[in-house]
Amino acid sequence: MDDTTLGGYQQVHGRPPAFGAADGQAYSVATFADDTADAGRYGAALLFVRWGEGEKPVGHLETDYLAFGATPDEALAPVLALTLEQVKAHLDRCVARGSA
């Protein structure tokens, strides 16, 4: 199993990867997909949870939809295949967009 992808990392380590961001905050990442289809397709995206002191989440950021599929699993597959470097780039864009 390749732990350089989001899905691989989660399988190998049994937890989501965490990143430091340009805003000085720590974030973990999760994926999500629509519960119901829109126009026959499901969207999938990344959800970044911002952590405060201790173990309490204090906010979140999310990407726009990154992939679509006929099922939630089909939509999630390309998101889970993203490299951790690509995931970090999405986090950096979300942080920049949030502070603009």
Question: Which residue ranges define each predicted feature?
Answer:
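Acidic-enriched, low-complexity/disordered segments with a strong bias for Aspartate over Glutamate
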Residues: 2-3, 23, 34-38, 64, ...
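Broad hydrophobic/π-residue packing in well-ordered secondary structure
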Residues: 18, 22, 40-42, 82
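Short, compact, well-ordered microdomains
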Residues: 59-100
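Generic hydrophobic secondary-structure signal
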Residues: 1, 10, 29, 46-48, ...
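Negatively charged, low-complexity tracts enriched in Asp/Glu with abundant Ser/Thr
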Residues: 1-28
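Charge-rich alpha-helical segments
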Residues: 11, 19-20, 49-51, 56-59, ...
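A short, structured beta-strand/loop element
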Residues: 29-66
